[in-house]
Amino acid sequence: MSSQNSFMSSKKDDKGKNIQVVVRCRPFNQLERKASSHSVLECDAPRKEVCVRTGGINDKLGKKTYTFDMVFGPAAKQIDVYRSVVCPILDEVIMGYNCTVFAYGQTGTGKTFTMEGERSADEEFTWEQDPLAGIIPRTLHQIFEKLSENGTEFSVKVSLLEIYNEELFDLLSPSPDVGERLQMFDDPRNKRGVIIKGLEEVSVHNKDEVYHILERGAARRKTASTLMNAYSSRSHSVFSVTIHMKETTVDGEELVKIGKLNLVDLAGSENIGRSGAVDKRAREAGNINQSLLTLGRVITALVERAPHIPYRESKLTRILQDSLGGRTKTSIIATVSPASINLEETVSTLEYANRAKNIMNKPEVNQKLTKRALIKEYTEEIERLKRDLATAREKNGVYLSNENYEQLQGKVLSQEEIITEYTEKITAMEEEIKRINELFAENKKELEECTTILQCKEKELEETQKNLHESKEQLAQEAFVVTALETTEKKLHGTANKLLTTVRETSKDVSGLHAKLDRKRAVDQHNTQVHENFAEQMDKRFSVIERSVDEYSVKQQGMLDFYTNSIDNLLGASSAALSVTATAVAKSFTSVQETVSEKVSHSVDEILKQETLSSQAKDDLQKLMAAHRTGLEQALRTDLLPVVTAVLNLNSHLSHCLQNFQAVADKIDSHKEEMNSFFTEHSRSLHRLRLDSGSALSSIQSEYESLKVEIETAQSMHSEGVNNLIGSLQNQLNLLAMETQQNFSGFLAKGGKLQKSVGCLQQDLDSISSDAIEHTSSHHDKFAGQSQDIAVEIRQLAASNMGTLEESSKQCEKLTGSINAISRESQHWCESASQQIDSLLEEQVCYLRTSKKHLQSLQKDVEVGCGASVVEITEHVNAQRQAEEKALTSLVEQVRDDKEMLGEQRLELHEQVQSGQNKVNSYLNEELRNDVPTGTTPQRRDYVYPSLLVRTKPRDVLLEQFRQQQQEYLESISSVISEAVEPPVEQDSLEDEPPVAVNDSVMSEKSCIDLSMVCQENGGVPFFQQKKALRKEKENRANTTLLERSKIMDEAEQSLPKSKLPLRMQN
């Protein structure tokens, strides 16, 4: 039981795993920049947060923050999204999981670009280097790379499904009919899966075929241009990748592992008002929004754990049923826009993605199939389809009652379940042994690796200690050099302070001088420039004004004189023109009167001609009607009589057909005899089939015996392998061997039962074959009787056709009589038409006569009207001439008044120009600036500053001095320690101090270097030289107390840190 539980746990890992949700924000596009839209989205990739400003620009409180599994900002690249989202999923697909990745978001936010991308101009890019490639081409490229590196046999098949207006279409179908709709059915092997009938799966052999497949699908996919996106996807697409991989177990058995990856590119949700969709585009948008709303309801129901999930309300949710709450690992990429004009859609997308995080899936690894089982399954399926096809073609087969068929199917299903159960148990045990062996090998390998790493680390530690010793020596030398450099730096710092003080004083004086010069220069330049520019501009302006005023006055005077002369001339010319106009009008009316009289007489002549032509047309029409009647009679004789003859010929032809029917009946009788012989031969073949099936079942019995022997052999080999391979796990293996023994015994018992069931099946097959022979004989007798009935019916049909022919002859005679009647009726019609035409012609002649009288009366009216019009025009022209003379006289008076007014304006303008010149002179004389002394100009003086700089000694000299000081210090320390140890020390003076044990071997190289680094600031002398001087002074004094010696020992002890490493000196 423990092995079975471990197998089930390894098969169903990652129970209750949440859907992974990723948010990607695209950059601003040109449409959003033209609309002056600002950003309302802040993406924090390290913290995996997205912040949305729902208020105004200055509203700091109106923010909403969402947390997701991953967040990609506008600067994120295609490869970053792929490596973070799809690479881990791809490894799980190769392990045998079903995985789904789909992109959701508003239209125009980059879903298709994320899933498919674009193809770069240089086709030599790999999937990692191509900057524009999307998830689909990168996925297939990496699948081929990974599987090729593993060295396993594999096959990759892809399919591309489109959901457009709630209809399914295959974008990779080889048929030219793009509009062929597909049907969807529930998968009986997977309760949450579906099967698409007729969906084409294309085999992909290398990564170079990926772009060709995508181009085929993109060429058929429905796209259109809207106001929000130039290439808006109008449908959902599902790109499925199925991988079959072959594995070889320890026993040499070949297994087939299946992994599936669904890459879904959803159509974007859109606002019809903003996208400008109408008619067909509006219906598409409605269907898209409807399917996305259903998807949202499904997600809400899954999060709230509702009892009913509305998967079947949309074909999109029905296809994604296993990806939402099923056994598939799912990732959602939500694409959003950062622009403020898309704030509502962005918030809706983020809310949708935030709800989808809480969906729980239960991923399961697809069951591995053995190669033999898979081939056997395919072979049985092919044979079954062949038998069904042959039966359908020949309309032949084995027929059973429903009870026997259901009983047989129940037995087969129960036996298949028993065999499947024991096969799974054996597979679980084999996998458990394989896992234990792999674990042992991995632990052994890890132990060897750890041993190797430990040896390497020990070598590295020795090298590090050696490098540490050298580094400490170099550090001590550098510290001594730095001390000397600090001393020199302090001296240089004092010199620099003095120089900076002098520089500040000189800079202050120079600034004062420059300020003085700038003030002088500014005043001079300002006055000169203002004076010159203002004087020049004002002189030019006043000269131009004065000249223009003079010219304007002269011109106005000339214009007034010209107006006066022109008006006088206009009055004379107008009077003459009016007189001429009156005379011309009178002449024109006279000519009009003559013309009208002439035209009326001409019209009378035309009417007379029309009467003559009408009479002639009447005669011609009567002749035409007579010719029509003659032609119609001739057509009836020449055309219809042959038709009647043809009908009679058809009657004779039908008689010949009846004779043919009689011959067919004779042939059917011969066919009946042939069928008798066929059914006899068929009965013999069924008998042979029964004998062949008996021999086949006997061979199955022998194969079962051999299989039984092989199972017993495998059992003995398994026991020996378990005893020899693992000794440390003896107790567990004993339990495993007992369980295996019990399972094998049960398997042998079931095999015995299977043998009995095969015997029963053989007996059933014999009985079924006998029934089939009897059934075939009964069908033979039935078919012979039916053939005889058919022959009798054909003879009866021939007799009925003879009656039909006689009736058709009678109808032909009736047709001849009706044709003669039609001829008489057409003659009568021609006579009546001739009478109607005569009456119409007479009416036309009467109408022309009345028109003649009307034109004569019109001529008289025109003559009277023209005379009256001439009188009126003459009176009107005279009145017009008097009005113009009066208006021109008043105009001359007005022009004289304007001339006097212009003279007055000229005098006023001269006065204004004179006053302007006076103002300019006062400005130039009174308003110019002068330079005023400020008293801040510096006086001349001398500056004192240092002229020499201190320089540090060379590095070689400093290092030599350091070595000498170190040597002297070590000698002084040795002497001090020796003097402190030689004389006896009183116990009372050392009670308060800890015991000191000094040994050269206990000192570390660090302590030595630290002693050599401590120096005083006065001249760079180290403190150990001062101790040496104290030691010499102590030696010269004879009465040195024990307290002073103890103080020296304390100083030495404090300056020497304790260490367990030996002291190494290299001078």
Curated annotation (Swiss-Prot):
Ranges for region Disordered: 1048-1067
Record flagged with keyword ATP-binding: yes
Residues recorded as binding ATP, renumbered to this chain, are G105, Q106, T107, G108, T109, G110, K111, T112
UniProt-recorded Gene Ontology molecular function terms = ATP binding; microtubule binding; microtubule motor activity; protein kinase binding
Relate the assembly described in the record: Heterotetramer of two heavy and two light chains. Interacts with aurka.
What biological process terms from GO does the record include? cell division; microtubule-based movement; mitotic spindle assembly
Which compartments is it annotated to reside in? Cytoplasm; Cytoplasm, Cytoskeleton, Spindle pole
Similarity annotation: Belongs to the TRAFAC class myosin-kinesin ATPase superfamily. Kinesin family. BimC subfamily.
| Post-translational modifications | Phosphorylation of Thr-937 during mitosis controls the association of this protein with the spindle apparatus.
Which sequence ranges form a coiled-coil region, renumbered to this chain?
A: 365-480
Annotated InterPro entries: KIF11-like, KIF11-like_kin_motor_dom, Kinesin-assoc_MT-bd_dom, Kinesin_motor_CS, Kinesin_motor_dom, Kinesin_motor_dom_sf, P-loop_NTPase
* PTM sites of type Phosphothreonine: T937
Pfam families on file: Kinesin, Microtub_bind
Protein name as catalogued: Kinesin-like protein KIF11
Residues annotated with Phosphoserine modification: S1046
GO CC aspect terms? centrosome; cytoplasm; spindle microtubule; spindle pole
Question: Keywords of this protein's UniProt record, alphabetized?
Answer: ATP-binding, Cell cycle, Cell division, Coiled coil, Cytoplasm, Cytoskeleton, Microtubule, Mitosis, Motor protein, Nucleotide-binding, Phosphoprotein
Give the Kinesin motor domain ranges.
18-359
Q: What does this protein do?
A: Plus end-directed motor protein required for establishing a bipolar spindle. Associates with both interphase and mitotic spindle microtubules. May be involved in nuclear divisions taking place during the development of unfertilized eggs. Required in non-mitotic cells for transport of secretory proteins from the Golgi complex to the cell surface.
